[in-house]
Amino acid sequence: NSVNPCCDPQTCKPIEGKHCISGPCCENCYFLRSGTICQRARGDGNNDYCTGITPDCPRNRYN
């Protein structure tokens, strides 16, 4: 197993000063900027965007 550079192996939480370990809105241990597309629209839906405060990709409320 490779060690995740964002993760404190003792606590399984982000290393001090880092924001996140993984997720569609996490890159190199930091949250992606608000407004970054994390899921492109399919069909008649709308794109989903990162919030800048979580590693998750929330569903667009207009979908």
From Swiss-Prot:
Keyword Cytoplasm: no
Cellular compartments per GO CC: extracellular region
Keywords: Cell adhesion impairing toxin, Disulfide bond, Hemostasis impairing toxin, Platelet aggregation inhibiting toxin, Secreted, Toxin
First and last residue of the signal peptide: none
Domain called Disintegrin: residue spans: 1-63
Highest taxon of source: Eukaryota
Organ and tissue specificity: Expressed by the venom gland.
Cysteines engaged in disulfide bonds, as pairs: C6-C29, C20-C26, C25-C50, C38-C57
Motif (Cell attachment site) on chain: 42-44
InterPro entries: Disintegrin_CS (IPR018358), Disintegrin_dom (IPR001762), Disintegrin_dom_sf (IPR036436)
Molecular function GO labels: toxin activity
Subcellular location: Secreted
Gene3D superfamilies assigned to the protein according to its UniProt record, in alphabetical order: Disintegrin domain (4.10.70.10)
Family: Belongs to the disintegrin family. Dimeric disintegrin subfamily.
Subunit architecture: Heterodimer with subunit A; disulfide-linked.
Known function: May bind to both alpha-IIb/beta-3 (ITGA2B/ITGB3) and alpha-V/beta-3 (ITGAV/ITGB3) integrins, and may inhibit platelet aggregation.
Classification via PANTHER family: ADAM A DISINTEGRIN AND METALLOPROTEASE DOMAIN, ADAM METALLOPROTEASE
This protein's name: Disintegrin schistatin-like subunit B
Lineage: Eukaryota, Metazoa, Chordata, Craniata, Vertebrata
